[in-house]
Amino acid sequence: MTSTPLPRLILGSSSPYRRELLERLRLTFEVAVPDINETPLAGESPEATALRLSLNKAQAIAQRHPDALIIGSDQVLTLDGRQMGKPGSHDKAREQLRLMRGRTATFHSALCLLDGRTGQSQLADVQTRVTMRDLTDAEIDAYLRLEKPYDVAGSAKSEGLGIALLSRVESDDPTALVGLPLIALTSMLRQSGYPFFAA
């Protein structure tokens, strides 16, 4: 009896942090960068935004690689119900960190595993509550000069020096905060026939 070969696995992300997380699973995968509009829709909840964008990213890659299994992911940060994206500049990053100091924000880390062959998708949203230390303006500016976290939601790279900005992290998945929830992903991959610990 012959087993069906597994489809190619593609990570649809430009993030080096997500790539590093996926490498932990010791699976062979490729990386492709999706090109989509990431603007939130009017009235859309943070969870809905993150889930929609993770699906859209996977679908964009599937158009180019219809024979593959594609991982799409997105992360949306909320504070008091307000969505906060990637700052893109020093001034906006400073503003974000000033707003969050001493307070608790929620990261929605959405994940999509899309089978390009069938169009079937699995979706999950893993939430992480993060409490910031009560940082001084000088600490915020020093951190921003050192790490330049302008490409991450919330302006704090928890996988780097940004961990020193935090006083508490609450999540069901320790990898969700970095942007790729591996517990949810391994469950999805198992359902798609990917073996872990195969002899």
From Swiss-Prot:
Nucleoside triphosphate pyrophosphatase that hydrolyzes 7-methyl-GTP (m(7)GTP). May have a dual role in cell division arrest and in preventing the incorporation of modified nucleotides into cellular nucleic acids. GO terms for biological process: nucleotide metabolic process. GO terms for cellular component: cytoplasm. Pfam families: Maf (PF02545). InterPro entries: ITPase-like_fam, Maf-like. It comes from Cupriavidus pinatubonensis (strain JMP 134 / LMG 1197) (Cupriavidus necator (strain JMP 134)). Its main location: cytoplasm. The keyword Hydrolase applies. This is 7-methyl-GTP pyrophosphatase. Its cofactor is a divalent metal cation. It catalyses: N(7)-methyl-GTP + H2O = N(7)-methyl-GMP + diphosphate + H(+). Its EC number is 3.6.1.-. NCBIfam families: maf (TIGR00172). The record marks 17, 75, 159 as: Important for substrate specificity. PANTHER family: BIFUNCTIONAL DTTP/UTP PYROPHOSPHATASE/METHYLTRANSFERASE PROTEIN-RELATED (PTHR43213), BIFUNCTIONAL DTTP_UTP PYROPHOSPHATASE_METHYLTRANSFERASE PROTEIN-RELATED (PTHR43213:SF5). It comes from the Bacteria. Belongs to the Maf family. YceF subfamily. The active site is at residue 74. GO terms for molecular function: nucleoside triphosphate diphosphatase activity.
